[in-house]
Amino acid sequence: VDEEKLNAALAAEAAASNRKIIVLDDDPTGVQTVHDIYVYTNWTVESLRKGFAAPEKLFFILTNSRGFTVAETTKAHREIAENTAKVAREFGMDYLIISRGDSTLRGHYPLETDLLREVTEAENGYKMDGDILCPYFREGGRFTLDNVHYVRYGAELVPCGQTEFAKDETFG
């Protein structure tokens, strides 16, 4: 794959789009790997307005929801979806919410994406087809090949179920 050509094509599509991409991160891992974009630590209407007004096509919201209870994450994700729909209407923009987490075992999947879908469908009057799972985190050394998720240790790829973390009952 010609990475330079691919990046140029993606940049051209993003520039032509009237869509804002909002990435929700359930812990700080993801935001540690990005640059030149805004990262908000709340989802107030005021913060979302700043994100929608910014020229960048994408912004992050660090929810830290991995550490939330079910009740807390339910409240937070309903608020995020409602506030995002409200602000998008104000700006006359389409949007896409990406729920980014690097652990489906320790996070609130599928609760969070189900809530986002439920509220977004109700707010916007269209049906979403489902979730797209992308088990890939290059910066964290995590890859999926032939339906097996691996963690890179140096030059070696180890199936994640065989890592020290998978065996550590206090980790998850």
What are these model-derived regions, one by one?
Residues 11-25, 32-35, 51, 55-57, ...:
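Cap/lid and interdomain-hinge subdomains that line or gate substrate/regulatory clefts
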Residues 36-50:
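Short catalytic helix/loop segments, enriched in acidic residues and glycine
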Residues 61-66:
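Short loop/turn segments at strand-loop or loop-helix junctions that form parts
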Residues 6-11, 47-49:
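Short secondary-structure capping/turn segments at boundaries of alpha-helices and beta-strands
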Residues 39, 58-60:
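Conserved beta-strand scaffold positions in the cores of enzyme catalytic domains, especially
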Residues 1-8, 40-43:
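Short coil-to-helix leader/linker segments, especially the first N-terminal amphipathic alpha-helix
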